[in-house]
Amino acid sequence: MSRKLKLKRVIARLDVKGPNIVKGVQMEGLRVLGDPEEFAEYYYNQGADEIIFSDIVASLYGRNSLLEVVSKTAKNIFIPLTVGGGIRSLKDINDVLRAGADKISLNSAAIKNPQLIDDAVKEFGSSTITIAIEVNLLDKKYEILYNNGRELAHIDLEKWIIECQERGAGEILLTAIHRDGTGQGFDIKLIDQVNKIVKVPLIVQGGAGSTKDIEKIISYKVDGIVLSSALHYTKIAQKDDTYKDTSSEGNKEFIKNKKTFLNFKNLDIKMIKQIVDS
């Protein structure tokens, strides 16, 4: 049975390390950008349909430090809040939901222990469980990674998606690491490949940098688009038009190759919503 698409969702993703939002390129060369609660409230006021918080070092260090951020944010925004990173057990899920999250995102823990998907769905419901799948293009092949893109999972992409669906996952969050933070557009080939097998809502991330990218993706069968760099740097530029990108910070190798973090064309949520809703 083919899935029925609802109205597209425009989702802001905030990668958190300690008390700060950070962002890099292809999950490397991280920069501190600001306060997660302030950014989340800003995107909420702009009309975001959902916020994703991801603790990008939680899985690596075996911790979950987002509870306070989630609790404070949930008091001021009234749209779905999804939380990922460091969630390894039903207790972790319960703690995050009690803090104010509406959904949780599993990646590393699900790869290491797929039974957690079944248990989480049984305990909290399918609509609460999102499976995050991070994919990189390595030697012309799409490979799944985990621990925020640090380790190869050695799992076939299509088989993993099918397994997650069969275990009851309510949604797939597909991130193209090789497009992350580049502003070079979504990986349409990857999305096409996944669309052939996915039966649950699919939200995609990685590469949005212009209105043309948004116009192109809405013609494909995706339920939502997730943006981070494109929104963050537009927000910073609007707040301080003296902000400049330099090769003295962040991923120097990426910038040296004549690409920059600011390869974005003044994208904000209000503008994106107008395109999506037109």
List the model feature ranges, each with a label:
Residues 16-18, 22-23, 101-179:
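Conserved anion-binding
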Residues 6-9, 22, 75-83, 126-130, ...:
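Short beta-strand/loop segments at the ligand-binding rim of alpha/beta enzyme cores
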Residues 77, 81-104, 189-227:
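Catalytic cores of alpha/beta
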Residues 117-124, 215-278:
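C-terminal helical cap(s) of enzyme catalytic domains, especially alpha/beta-barrels
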Residues 66-126:
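Glycine/small-residue-rich loop that forms an oxyanion/phosphate-binding "nest" at active or ligand-binding sites
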Residues 50-69, 108, 173-184:
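Glycine-rich, proline-tolerant flexible connector loops at the mouths of alpha/beta enzymes
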Residues 9-14, 23, 51-53, 81-85, ...:
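Hydrophobic faces of well-ordered beta-strands that scaffold small-molecule active sites
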Residues 15, 43, 51, 83, ...:
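Conserved, mostly hydrophobic/aromatic
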